[in-house]
């Protein structure tokens, strides 16, 4: 199993390039940055993890594509990933250009994780109807794939339409970078399969259920699509079982306020995954 690190990179942490060099030096396969454009000062939406108050880094994180570019240009082999880009809140033509640009500048090292979002007020501030976000997500993935794959692209969907547009650079990864759909709900597997995306499940309390779902996804995709685990429990036995079921990667969320703090957490992860991690 490939092992990565996830960090909320903000104006109060190490810079993305400093973080990336450290993560690569420790031998991790990938580095992931979340995506929030802002934090509403008043929100009735509860965090999926049940926080009583949303962490301050949600309002302070750097733009995900700027951070990924800095991380990629500071390293040689480290894969860089969005974990996850809130695609319903972004223009698909502009985002396709940004994704392709990062993949081009990184030499094909981008992993494009996407999600529908969970903070209702945040998406409403972008003019997104929360009830439409899952349809928007699927529509925009398909539209962006057309832009990446075709020299002259057209798309006519429910939420996105354009006719005969040209956009370069094209991604180094052809026909497009790896797209991973972040979702945990009962329709998560079907949603990922519908847009030909890898599955990116978050932490599950039901370990046996997650193992079964990973195996189901791999079987239903005939092994063509992968599974990456977002911040699973750091339990060697559970990770080994998930790897056996077909999960190819896991990344773990750690703080990054200082080099010492990062090294402490990365050392613990390295020790826990010894014997599970693959190059």
What residue spans do the PLM features occupy?
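Active-site-adjacent structural elements that line small-molecule/cofactor binding pockets in enzymes
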Residues: 1-279
């Amino acid at each position: 199993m490939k092992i990565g690190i996830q960090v909320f990179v903000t104006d109060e942490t190490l810079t993305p390039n400093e973080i990336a060099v450290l993560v690569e030096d420790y031998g991790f396969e990938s580095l992931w940055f979340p995506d929030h454009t802002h934090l509403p000062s008043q929100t009735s939406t509860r965090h999926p993890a049940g926080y009583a108050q949303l962490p301050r880094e949600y309002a302070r994180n750097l733009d995900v594509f700027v951070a990924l570019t800095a991380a990629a240009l500071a390293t040689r082999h480290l894969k860089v990933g969005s974990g996850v880009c809130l695609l319903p809140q972004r223009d698909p033509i502009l985002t396709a250009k940004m994704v392709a640009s990062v993949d081009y500048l990184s030499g094909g090292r981008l992993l494009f994780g996407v999600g529908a979002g969970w903070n209702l007020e945040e998406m409403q501030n972008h003019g997104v109807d929360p009830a439409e976000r899952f349809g928007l997500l699927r529509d925009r993935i398909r539209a962006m794939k057309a832009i990446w794959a075709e020299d002259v692209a057209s798309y006519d969907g429910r939420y996105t339409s354009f006719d005969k547009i040209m956009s370069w650079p094209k991604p180094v990864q052809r026909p497009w970078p790896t797209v991973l759909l972040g979702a945990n709900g009962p329709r998560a597997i079907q949603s990922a399969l519908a847009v030909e995306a890898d599955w990116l499940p978050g932490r599950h309390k039901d370990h046996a259920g997650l193992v079964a779902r990973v195996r189901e996804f791999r079987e239903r995709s005939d092994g063509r699509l992968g599974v990456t685990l977002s911040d699973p429990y750091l339990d060697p036995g559970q990770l080994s079982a998930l790897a056996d079921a077909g999960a190819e990667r896991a990344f773990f969320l750690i703080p990054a306020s200082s080099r010492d703090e990062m090294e402490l957490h990365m050392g613990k992860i390295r020790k826990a995954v010894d014997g599970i991690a693959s190059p």
